[in-house]
Amino acid sequence: MLGLIKETIDRLRYKIPLRPRQIQIEITNRCNMDCPMCQREDLGIELEHMSWTHFATVVDKLGQRENITLTGWGEPFIHPRVFDMIAYCKERGHKVMVTSNGLFTKPSMVDDILNSAVDTITFSIDSVNGNETVTDGHTSNKVYENIEAVVKGRKPGTLGVRLQATLHANCDNDLYDVIRYGARIGCDIINVGRLDRQFRPNLERPDAQQERSIFLKADEIARSCGIQLDWLQ
C-alpha cells in the first residue's frame, strides 16, 4: 500500500522512475483475427515472428524480477515457441503476462497454458453477444469456451485471468455484459480501454459526457458483481 501511495505521489509530481514498471515484448505481429480497430495492417511493416535469438538477447539485457508482457499487434499464442519464451523468462525470475484474443489454433492450447508458468493471461473481448469480428470460419463461441476452460482449469492461487474490453460508441451494454460475464465465470479483473482511432477515423467512441456516465454505471455493476474494474486510459 505504501508503495502504491508513493507511486501515485510521484506521478502527480511528474517524477519519472529510473526503470519502467513493465516491459512489453511483441513476439509476433501476425494474427488469426482481423479486428476492425486493429492498426496492424496500417503500419506498413513486415508481418513476422520474433526470432528466438532476438528474444533471448532482449530478455538477457533485463534485470531481475521484471514484469514482462508478451503482447503487441499480433496474437502471441500463434508463435511456435511462445511457451519456450514464457519458460525462459520465468527461469530468470521474471513475472510473465500474455494478452490473447482467445482464438486458439490447436486443441492442446488450454492445457499448454495451464501447464506453463505464465502468471497472468488477459483475453481481449469486447462483447459476449457474438459481435467480435473473426475470420477463417471461426466463431466467437469458441473464444468463450477457451476462456472458460482456462478459468475453470487453473489451480487456486496460480494463473491470473483478466478480460480486456475496448469501449466503442453505442456499445455500453456490451461492456456491462462483459463485466457480468467475467464475474460469473470467475475472472479476476476487467480492464477497459479507449478506442484508438488514429488509423480508423470512421470508428466512433463515446464523448466525454457519455464516457463519464458509462464509467459510473460500469463501476456500479462491477461492485455489485464483486469483480475489480480497471480503466487503462
Give residue spans per PLM region:
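Conserved alpha-helical substructure of the radical SAM core
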Residues: 1-120, 134, 141, 201-222
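Radical SAM enzyme [4Fe-4S]-AdoMet core and its adjacent flexible, acidic
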Residues: 26, 48-53, 92, 111-233
